[in-house]
Amino acid sequence: MAKVSELYDVTWEEMRDKMRKWREENSRNSEQIVEVGEELINEYGSKLGDDIWIIYEQVMIAALDYGRDDLALFCLQELRRQFPGSHRVKRLTGMRFEAMERYDDAIQLYDRILQEDPTNTAARKRKIAIRKAQGKNVEAIRELNEYLEQFVGDQEAWHELAELYINEHDYAKAAFCLEELMMTNPHNHLYCQQYAEVKYTQGGLENLELSRKYFAQALKLNNRNMRALFGLYMSASHIASNPKASAKTKKDNMKYASWAASQINRAYQFAGRSKKETKYSLKAVEDMLETLQITQS
């Protein structure tokens, strides 16, 4: 097999810099990381200096993802020699257990890490990842709640908890998690959109009105958010046809839905689609408008 450096005519410095760039971007291109990283380690290890240790870790994680346990084990052994007793290296050992589906061994290892260092967030998150991999969502939810009691500012954990609640159809608790996220990230249009979707799913006039409000907010923050635009149309349409809504509320929401449908129509007209696709897309929007007119009459 040809070497990466020969195949693409790149120097070892360029390969090292590429690995650094992938780390900074949190890239999940495991195959490329394995190809470039394995050559760096084998051919240029002596030139890498202290960079070699972070590259060993990077390559090991990619190798697990790519199914190269031989390479993952080699990198892990080198890291163990250099950093005996390191919690970070122990966590990597646990990740290898996970890849081998030795979940009980991995959890025992993470528990030992947490006994020595209760603030080790990485070990806690790996335990939660195992529960999810096993389909044990209830246990994952319990552990995430315990984690958030100590690390309330972890936005990634709040979002993960919201997703788990959605999977369990516990929409009230999912909404609470998303409210926490919106408090700290008021300009994140995706959180507004997801909160609106949860409220829409809950149903009922009050939730539908909140849903429409937050779909509109998501659009205000990002006017290219087509999912929010469709959500605005759907929520306003349902409010307009809700028997509990007042006449004024129905009339106002008919206007909102009509506006949303016209914006969807316009977006499809300007999209770079084939004529056939545009024809069917526009037909769908026209059907929306026709439905509105029928409801209004």
Swiss-Prot record:
Protein name: ER membrane protein complex subunit 2
Subcellular location as annotated: Endoplasmic reticulum membrane
Subunit: Component of the ER membrane protein complex (EMC). Interacts with WNK1 (via amphipathic alpha-helix region); promoting the ER membrane protein complex assembly by preventing EMC2 ubiquitination.
Modifications made to the protein after synthesis: Ubiquitinated when soluble in the cytoplasm, leading to its degradation by the proteasome. Interaction with EMC2 prevents its ubiquitination and degradation.
GO molecular function, one term: membrane insertase activity
Family indicated by similarity: Belongs to the EMC2 family.
Gene Ontology cellular component annotations, sorted alphabetically: cytoplasm; EMC complex; endoplasmic reticulum; endoplasmic reticulum membrane; extrinsic component of endoplasmic reticulum membrane
Gene designation per UniProt: EMC2
Summary of the function given for this chain in its UniProt record: Part of the endoplasmic reticulum membrane protein complex (EMC) that enables the energy-independent insertion into endoplasmic reticulum membranes of newly synthesized membrane proteins. Preferentially accommodates proteins with transmembrane domains that are weakly hydrophobic or contain destabilizing features such as charged and aromatic residues. Involved in the cotranslational insertion of multi-pass membrane proteins in which stop-transfer membrane-anchor sequences become ER membrane spanning helices.
